[in-house]
C-alpha cells in the first residue's frame, strides 16, 4: 500500500483525480480522504486499482481529441457514475467492478475514434440506435466492431477475464442471459448494471430508452434484484447531479 501510494503521489494529476472521485457523493464515504494513503486505506487495494485503471483510460484517450471523444467521455463517465448508484440497490455487484466495467464497456469506440477519420459519421448515423445496429454498421465498414476492439484493449490491460468477456458480449445480451457456452465467461450482473446505467443516463438527459432495454429489461432487473420502480429513484438520485465546477 505504501509503495502504491508513493507511486501515485508522484503524479499530481492522477492523485488529484483519485481524491476528487473518492470524495464525491457517489462513493458515499462517511469520512473524506485527505491524501492518497487515506484513500487506499478507506477503499482498499482492489477498489483503488480499478479506479486508477479507469483514470488511466482517460489519459490514454484524452478529451481534447475532438468533439466525438468529448461526447464519448461525457456519456461513459455519466454511465460509470450511474453504475455506482445502481450497485447501492442491486445484489451481488461490487461497486468498483461495476464502475470499471461500465467505464470500459465502450472503450473500443475510443480506439476507433482515434483510428478512423470517418468513424464519426457512422456514430452520428446511429445516434438513436447506439447498440447492435451500430455494431453491425461497424462490422460492415471495418470488419470488426467496438465490442471486439474493447475486448482486445481490456485484455491488453490485463483486466479480469470476466470483465473482458462481458465487454466483448455487451451487445449479445441474449447469449449472456441464457448462459450459452460462448457466453460462459461473461458476468450477467455486470452486463445488467451497464445496461441499466445507460438507461438512467438517457432518461436523465430526456432521451428515449434503447431497444436493448426494451428487449432485455426483465433480464436486467431480475439479475440485479431491482424493482421497476427503483429506476425512478435512480434517475432522481441527487448524487448523479453535476457538482459545481464539473463538466
Q: Each predicted region: which residue ranges?
A:
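Conserved alpha-helical "signature site"
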Residues: 1-120, 124-214, 240
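Terminal helices and disordered tails flanking the catalytic cores of nucleotide-processing hydrolases
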Residues: 185-189, 219-247
Amino acid at each position: 500500500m505504501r509503495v502504491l501510494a508513493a507511486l501515485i503521489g508522484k503524479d499530481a494529476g492522477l492523485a488529484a483525480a483519485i481524491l476528487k472521485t473518492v470524495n464525491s457523493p457517489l462513493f458515499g464515504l462517511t469520512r473524506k480522504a485527505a491524501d492518497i494513503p487515506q484513500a487506499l486505506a478507506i477503499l482498499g487495494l482492489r477498489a483503488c486499482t480499478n479506479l486508477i485503471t479507469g483514470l488511466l483510460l482517460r489519459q490514454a484517450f484524452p478529451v481534447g481529441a475532438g468533439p466525438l471523444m468529448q461526447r464519448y467521455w461525457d456519456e461513459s463517465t455519466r454511465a460509470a457514475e450511474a453504475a455506482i448508484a445502481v450497485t447501492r440497490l442491486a445484489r451481488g455487484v461490487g461497486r468498483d467492478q461495476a464502475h470499471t466495467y461500465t467505464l470500459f464497456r465502450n472503450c473500443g469506440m475510443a480506439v476507433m475514434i482515434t483510428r478512423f477519420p470517418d468513424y464519426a459519421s457512422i456514430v452520428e448515423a446511429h445516434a438513436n440506435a447506439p447498440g447492435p445496429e451500430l455494431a453491425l454498421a461497424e462490422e460492415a465498414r471495418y470488419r470488426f466492431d467496438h465490442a471486439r476492439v474493447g475486448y482486445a484493449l481490456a485484455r491488453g490491460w490485463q483486466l479480469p477475464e470476466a470483465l473482458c468477456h462481458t465487454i466483448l458480449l455487451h451487445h449479445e445480451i441474449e447469449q449472456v442471459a441464457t448462459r450459452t457456452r460462448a457466453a460462459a465467461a461473461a458476468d450477467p450482473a455486470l452486463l445488467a448494471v451497464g445496461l441499466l446505467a445507460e438507461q438512467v443516463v438517457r432518461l436523465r438527459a430526456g432521451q428515449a430508452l434503447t431497444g436493448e432495454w426494451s428487449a432485455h429489461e426483465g433480464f436486467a432487473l431480475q439479475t440485479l434484484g431491482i424493482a421497476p420502480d427503483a429506476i425512478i429513484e435512480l434517475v432522481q438520485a441527487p448524487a448523479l447531479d453535476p457538482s459545481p465546477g464539473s463538466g
